[in-house]
């Protein structure tokens, strides 16, 4: 009886541990640029923040930056459309991140996107305060 309780408890713990690996894909949409900046300054904040976090700039156009992040065998690609008033971080594709048709992905992707978002906002603030 005691063995059965331990076995059931162990299975329960393993099931709970596995539940948190995938989460809904986090898109950051229309984040306001709270300062009066030019579009090129917002672009610079996005690129500088991305590079400092290990993202690689794949394309940098006048209204959008495409970024790629690789960690071991995992790869994520995002688009960052921007203007002088707003920016967004949008999922494009991934490899080995457990992405599924329901819009779920490994939680590390959301952590990477959140860190990038926070860094972009900090960099925008630094640029605005240096003017």
Task: Name every feature range the model reports, one short phrase each.
Residues 1-8:
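Bacterial N-terminal signal peptides that target proteins for export
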């Amino acid at each position: 009886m005691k063995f059965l309780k331990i076995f059931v408890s162990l299975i329960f713990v393993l099931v709970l541990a596995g539940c948190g690996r995938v989460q809904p894909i986090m898109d950051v949409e229309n984040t306001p640029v709270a300062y009066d900046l030019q579009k090129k300054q917002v672009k610079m904040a996005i690129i500088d923040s991305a590079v400092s976090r290990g993202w690689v700039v794949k394309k940098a156009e006048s209204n959008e930056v495409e970024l790629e992040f690789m960690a071991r065998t995992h790869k994520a690609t995002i688009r960052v459309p921007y203007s002088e008033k707003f920016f967004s971080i949008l999922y494009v594709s991934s490899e080995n991140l457990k992405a599924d048709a329901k819009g779920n992905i490994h939680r590390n992707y959301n952590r990477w996107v959140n860190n990038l978002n926070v860094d972009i906002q900090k960099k925008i603030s630094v640029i605005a305060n240096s003017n």
